[in-house]
A protein has these predicted regions:
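Active-site entrance/lid segments in N-terminal catalytic domains of soluble metabolic enzymes
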Residues: 1-100, 205
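Conserved active-site-proximal phosphate/metal-binding subdomains
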Residues: 81-102, 108-253
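Conserved acidic functional residues
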Residues: 50, 105-106
Length: 253
């Protein structure tokens, strides 16, 4: 379960809801307060932190996180400026086996998994690819939009939240590119996009949205996604492809 920990007002109740409903892992995209870590650990819930910079990973480990997700700028959603290929090994080096490091950002198949393992990560975290599955929860048109996008159809915009966020380019992102001086800090801009009817984050398939303005996070790997695949089949194919890549690489010695 992922929450915006930079919006702390509802955090205790939200974390308690995760615990009460059997959540086993809490993932934070914008930092993890120490009291949240302690509450999760007291209830046998693992805590992971999305980290876009080396110093973020250092802070996450110091706060007691069980897992660090090294997320490159290619990722959909809130993201930084350092690419996955450069970020992952630097975070692996600084974490020094204190906790597992997982790679994220622009990864969509077994080749990405094999590459992440070669960089020292112990696994991968894929977001966009798993939105394009029948099981994923999302607003109408979101999955279809992902299937139609090319690798350069995303943009890093502050228009939806006030923070840098990689999303599907549309009329709303274009407006804020042209009116950047009017963007408010988080969470005011987040609230504004909701009030504008452009942000239905977390809403389901029965929600009415305007596809030309809607908040649809997407990573740069989106251009490789051309069909909806059941999540279980997708996991199996990713692992099989990674194994094939690793086997092929072993013949190059």
């Amino acid at each position: 379960v992922d929450l915006l920990t930079a919006a702390p007002g509802d955090m205790p109740a939200q974390v308690q809801a995760i615990i009460d409903n059997g959540g086993r892992v809490f993932v934070a995209g914008l930092g993890v307060p120490r009291d949240v870590v302690n509450l999760c650990h007291d209830n046998n819930v693992l805590v992971a932190s999305m980290c876009g910079k080396v110093r973020h990973a250092v802070a996450a480990v110091a706060a007691g996180c069980d897992l660090v997700i090294a997320q490159g700028t290619e990722a959909g959603g809130h993201t930084g400026t350092v690419a996955t290929m450069a970020l992952v090994p630097q975070i692996v080096d600084v974490v020094e086996n204190k906790v597992p490091v997982v790679a994220a950002g622009g990864l969509f198949d077994g080749r990405g998994l094999a590459a992440a393992l070669s960089l020292g990560a112990e696994g991968v975290w894929m977001g966009t690819r798993f939105i394009a599955t029948p099981e994923a929860w999302g607003t109408p048109g979101y999955k279809e939009k992902l299937l139609s996008m090319a690798e350069d159809d995303t943009v890093v915009s502050k228009g939806f939240t006030g923070k840098t966020c990689r999303v599907a380019r549309n009329d709303y992102t274009q407006y804020w590119e042209e009116h950047a001086s009017e963007i408010e800090p988080f969470p005011a801009q987040f609230i504004r996009s909701i009030n504008d009817g452009a942000n239905h984050l977390g809403a389901g398939p029965n929600t009415e949205v305007d596809p030309s303005r809607e908040f649809w996070p997407a990573g740069q790997g989106v251009g490789a996604i051309n069909e909806l695949v059941p999540a279980g089949d997708l996991v199996r194919s990713i692992v099989a492809e990674a194994e094939a890549v690793i086997d092929r690489m072993s013949t190059l010695r």
